[in-house]
Amino acid sequence: MALLNVISENPLTLQPGQVIAFDHLANGEHWQWALGTVVSSDKHVVVVEQWAVNEGSCETLKHNISSEIQKEMKRMGVFQEQLSSARDKLAAIRSENEDRVSAARAVFEDAKARVASVDEVHMREVTSQACPSPVAVEVLKCVLALAQNDPTVTNCSTWDDIRMEYRRPNAIADFISADITGKTYPNAEEICSSLNEQRLSSLAASRDSEAISSLHHWVLSALAYQEAYCRLTTDTRVQEQNDAIANCIAGMKGCRLKVMKLKEELERGGTPTFGGQLTSFTKTSVQLKAPLSSVISIVGVDPSAQDCVLTDDEVGLILDKAEQTRLQINDHFSHLSNSYMEAMAELHCLSMYTSELEERRLNLQERFVFSLFTNAGKTNAPRRERIETDVGLRSVEAPRGDSANNIKDLQEIIKELSSHDERWMYRNEPTVTTKHRKSYPGREWSKVVERKPEELLSTFRTEQAAACHVPEDAIRNIEFTATSEKLQVSFDVQHPVKQTAAEINKRLQEFPSRGMDRMLCDVDQPKKGLDRAIVEVCRAFDLREHAFRGMTFDKFIEEVAMKGRVGDKDAYESEIGDLLMLLDKIHNENRSLQYTLEKSAEEFRRQTASTMREQESLRQRNGELHAEIGRLRDLVEKLRDLADNQASELELLKLQKTQANQIRAQRNLSTFRGDDTAEPVYCVTLDELREQTEHCDQVERELERQREQCQNLLNAQDDLLAELSGVSEEKEKLEAECERLEAELRQMEEKSRLSEQGLSEMTQRLEEKQAEIEGLLENLEQLDEQLEALRAAEKSAQAHIEARDREISDLQQRLEGEIDDHIKTTALLEELRKHYNNLEELFDKQEAELMAYREKRQNAHKVRSLEPTLRPIGTQTKPFQEVVSADEISSEPLLSVTLDEYNDHMHRSNQFQQENDLLRQQLQQANDERENLHDRLEQLMAENQSLSEQLHNMHEELEREERDRSGVTLQNERLAEEIQRKTAENEQLVLENNKSRSDIRNLNVQVQRLMEELELKAAENEKLAEELELKAAENEKLAEELELKAAENEKLAEALDLKAAENEKLAEELELKVAENEKLAEELELKVAENEKLAEELELKAAENEKLAEELELKAAENEKLAEELELKAAENEKLAEELELKAAENEKLAEALDLKAAENEKLAEELDLKAAENEKLAEELELKVAENEKLAEELELKAAENEKLAEELELKAAENEKLAEELELKAAENEKLAEELELKVAENEKLAEELELKAAENEKLAEELELKAAENEKLAEELELKAAENEKLAEELELKVAENEKLAEELELKAAENEKLAEELELKAAENEKLAEELELKAAENEKLAEELELKAAENEKLAEELELKAAENEKLAEELELKAAENEKLAEELELKAAENEKLAEELELKAAENEKLAEELELKAAENEKLAEELELKAAENEKLAEELELKAAENEKLAEELELKAAENEKLAEELELKAAENEKLAEELELKAAENEKLAEELELKAAENEKLAEELELKAAENEKLAEELELKAAENEKLAEELELKVAENEKLAEELELKVAENEKLAEELELKVAENKRLAEEVTQRLSEKELLAEDTSARLLEADSANSALQCKVKHLEEKLTLLSSEKETALATLEAEIVDLLTQLKGLNGTNSALESLCASKEKELVFLREHCELWTDPTTKKEKVITRHVKVFDGNEWMKLITDRPEALMSAFVIDAGNACHVPGDQIHEVSFLNNKEKH
């Protein structure tokens, strides 16, 4: 059955027509997935029509992709429609819920106001009633329960408790002001049903009293409000719509990604299967049968389609699901195999048992047959076997009886221990109360009763309740009687009826008195609990403590009330309750602080552990990196050694060949007679070197002279390098000084801006004060003069700033020119570095060349040995593959070649001499150019010095301007003081208003001029920015010129290289490998060009990435600035609203004053003048506001309306603003929910974030490794340079070898006395050849030195290039900052549009870059930055939404106030139109300004709409990002689950393997035992067969004897026949008896076997039962409640534990009864841990989601 349960599972249900992905074995070797359309399916098999991979043409594939794009676009449209409908439904549901909440809130507020209006005296009368009405009691209980959120109040509280609660001061106010929406009342339906009954209805409450009626209404409205509020968050319809929206967004995202990839592939084109991007399928008619378990998933493809295209994401998802399916199938197969093995094992056991029974049956049958033929003497065998069987049974039953007794004893012990199990639970059963007594020995019990009566009572009740397994309230009527020797206690116990009084007494006597003993031992310890409360109350009320000793708290309260110290018992109890609550509050605060400390310590420990782990991982990584670096260095060293060896051997061979050629030419030998097509073999010894010594000395002297010249050049170059480094340092200092000056300039600009703001504020103050002191013409003239002075100072400061800006721009241009120069030199250095990188390839070529030289040398030796006229060389020839030492080569005689072109060679030598002269001239020109460069450097240093002086002067000028500005600020302060002094004279100058109006208008004109000047300054700043751009263009031109210069330098370097190549050709001209070397050189040049192109492309890519990063940073900075500007605008709008409110209040006051003054005709003119002045002030203030908001004023000019329609338009706008505010509230709610969801997602994706951080850390490590690799490459380049120096040293060593050869030549001179004549004839030619060789060597040395100088220059240029790049980056940043400053002066709306367009472009660029750089390590950092930016943008957008909502509210209030002002102004205009036409004109102006404000509001509304659209876009992006994060989280979870499953499967496999190994061992042992038993059985069978044959033979003999005796008896005597008959009868009887005996014996044996088998099972069951009973016994002993305190001192340790209690009322218990909760928990914890309660420390309670 178990195997059947494992096999039978619910199969996957598929419908015909569905497209599925399924697994199959390709070629029977590996798994492969494919698509198929379901044709039919049954329980285990599915028939599909297979889809094949499209192998058609590109046109077909493009057609498939286009059709797939159309399908995905249709799906996206469906998703969009579903999304819009879901959003509409969600908005409707939320609107409905919010309307319900607002209505319920309005009713609740009315009820609250109604309750608040009830008189406190009336409420006191209600609560002072002794027998109130039921409706009053129920309503007061409901109010108390609802305010405290405690349902037990309605069931457990008495009228006295309710009176106590309502007599507290401000109790009603506290109750009705409770947070109803904060906590949901659990039993709201019960209250509603009870209060809606007829006897407790609102009518009954209104009949009772007004207070009860108002409270009744408050309770019902509060419950309705609570229900409506809870509906906001618990409405399942909202979650359904949110899920639908999330599904739609996810679907849209998938469609969008697929469409993007399809479009990319469609644009790119390609083969039918693009490696990893797309996979195209075509439906076929081939039908396959596949098992149902091989189905991976259902693919979302239209069944009617004939073609489909899947992206790599969809394919990856299918592959992941396929892997999961395979793992599940493997797991299921392992379960099946395990179940099969178990069934097979069980079947094998049954077969073994059956075979054993069969053997026993056969054995018994044989015994029965054998017994039939035994003699009569053996008839007692069954009886003997029966006796033996009985004895065996008794021996078997004996342990059974012993085990039964043991089990019985164990059961008795377990029963006894289970009766004392400390984990008992009380059950509600019928109870009975019995009287009991208990005594405790001790002499100090009277002291305990006197000092701690309450603690003694609680301890005794707790202990006896635990002993009797009843609650504490079941221990009643406790009476303590203390004597000199013991404490006698009598008490009642309410226990279940099934327990008798004797059992209770037994429990009481057996239970250890731990708590009472501790009380007796700790009698002198401080009091606690109610005992301590009694002492504190006595001290608080100045009562004597000894008068209340031995009293309980209840008696104490009664005694205190009787003493009359406190007349009002209720007040006294309330004060005591307040004191106790204060104590509990203090204790709770201490616990919370302790818990906070513990949490902080735990967090600190966790952070420390994580930091240590990170450090350890970093150490390990560093160790690995160091090991890898060491390994690479060793490898590089080996390669260098090999290259050095090969280079030295090659140089020796080249030198030997060159010398052989020269000496053969000197000897004027004949040409080689051989094949002209092949290179001749050099076979002639050169012992005629006697006269070469002088020439060699000359060569050495010439080399020494050239070496000194090169050393001088190197020293000069070092000096130039030192000067360049000094210049670069000075340049860095100058750049730092420039940066500091730029920072100071920015600070000065900020200060100037602040001063301009101060000036604007001062002008506003002046205008306000001038409106009040319009008569002071002389003072106004002075103020005008001061303003002119300020303007002049400002102009001068601005002129100085502009001059500085121009100087700085010039300095920047110069620096950029130098930067371009260094960039060009850097390019040359890069080329040289690439040349060094190709040296390894040259090493390989040199090795091939060396092998060729070795082969040529061996051939030369062979040919020389074959030549009869030549003397053979003494050295033994070796194979050319073996390495030949340099000493051996140098010791061999030199061999020359046959040169029939000797005359041509001489001619060429002369030509090369001329070319060398030209090279000397060019070298001299290069030295001259170097000197010119040195002079230019000195000029640059002088210019830098002058620039530093100019910067110093500019700094001094800035300081002077700063002092001037401080003086101006002091003057401004003085002006402010003078203005304050002049305000006192305002009252006397009211009559001179008309004169001062013209002056004010002039000032306004001047202010406008100042604003225009500021605009001109802004335009000038823009012009400066354009000039900077022009300068940048000039710098680019200079860069191009520098590039040309660099190209010339490159040409010169190429010329030098060509000359060096020519020199090398001159040295190696006799070789026939010139063509090959030229080809190799061309290939190297091509490689260099390719490397240069690659380097340029890499630089371009790096520049593009840097630009993108800078653009991202700039965009982030611009967004932050926009947010700050929006905040500033919001603040300005708020200020404007406040000022408009103030003006509205002033206008109301003005209207009242006009109404009052209307009756007074004489004062009408004066009042009108005052009103005109006030209106002028209002107009001026509005003009100032318009000046402050010029950008907004330009937008507000579009909607000018008439005075009569303004009110209607404002009302319409107010309605629109209200709608927008509601929409914003909805959006804010949605954003809040999205923020909550984001927080949840962030909480869920913390692991992903950590993994991403780990990945980012790994990528950073990889980047660092790459940097290390780059540094190592640079080190390799430096080492190559060192190797070049070493090669030079080897050249010197070669020169030494030449000297040694010269010594050998001298020895040869002694031997060459016979050839003196020939030597004399060849001396001249040898001298000429030696001169040519020396000149060639000098040229080669000069070229090498020039190459080294170029390398040094390249290194210097690299450094300078790096510095210049840094400076260029800084200059670019400065230019970008200037451009940003210029761009900030544009309009806000244009900026927003541009930012939106830029953001879209950046989004597209980022997507393209993300697609291109998916495999780069920087993508993770960008993704992390994008997530952080999105989170910041979400926060910013939420803040903007809140601010916009506030602005809308303010604008609505402004619109309402403006409408009221318009109505007032219209009334005033109608009244005063007839009297003053001028006043009407001024009011019209004011109305026009108000129209501008209305237009401004409309513009703000439009901006809000734009913001809302942006917020929606951001929300969509956020949803997309959230979906991506969810996808990543799901993938990570799947991977984690897969890893866990794999780990579990591995563990299971390991465990299964171990089990199988153990079972195999057991099986082997069993097989061995069975084999032994089988052998024994075979032996027994043989023995039995022998016995049977013996018995048969004995029976035959016996039969013969009996027949003979019968014959004798018959023949002897017939009388014996009767006896024979009688004996036969007896024999038959005996045989029958034997048969019956055998049958009974067989039955008894079978019974014995069955009994033995049953006894074996019983014994095993008894053994397992005994083991379980022993375990239970140990467990019960561990949890026995009869434990006692240890008498010996043991080592103690403190551990921290957490216990969770379920429930939803723990918070109330924590706040209301903390001490009771603490004491109960301490008692339970002490009993559970078997320790005293004083060892339970640092207990803290935490309410977390209604669990503790």
Swiss-Prot record:
Transmembrane segments: none annotated. Gene3D superfamilies: 1.20.920.20. It comes from the Eukaryota. Residues 613-657, 684-864, 903-1663 form a coiled coil. GO terms for cellular component: cytoskeleton; motile cilium. Sequence repeats lie at residues 1012-1025, 1026-1039, 1040-1053, 1054-1067, 1068-1081, 1082-1095, 1096-1109, 1110-1123, 1124-1137, 1138-1151, 1152-1165, 1166-1179, 1180-1193, 1194-1207, 1208-1221, 1222-1235, 1236-1249, 1250-1263, 1264-1277, 1278-1291, 1292-1305, 1306-1319, 1320-1333, 1334-1347, 1348-1361, 1362-1375, 1376-1389, 1390-1403, 1404-1417, 1418-1431, 1432-1445, 1446-1459, 1460-1473, 1474-1487, 1488-1501, 1502-1515, 1516-1529, 1530-1543, 1544-1557, 1558-1571, 1572-1585. Residues 1012-1529 are annotated as: 41 X 14 AA tandem repeats of E-E-L-E-L-K-[VA]-A-E-N-E-K-L-A. InterPro entries: FAZ1_C, FAZ1_cons. Keywords: Cell projection, Cilium, Coiled coil, Flagellum, Repeat. It is found in: Cell projection, Cilium, Flagellum. A component of FAZ filament that is required for correct FAZ assembly and attachment. Not essential for new flagellum growth. PANTHER family: CILIA AND FLAGELLA-ASSOCIATED PROTEIN 58-RELATED (PTHR32083), TRANS-GOLGI NETWORK-LOCALIZED SYP41-INTERACTING PROTEIN 1 (PTHR32083:SF48). This is Flagellar attachment zone protein 1. It comes from Trypanosoma brucei gambiense (strain MHOM/CI/86/DAL972).
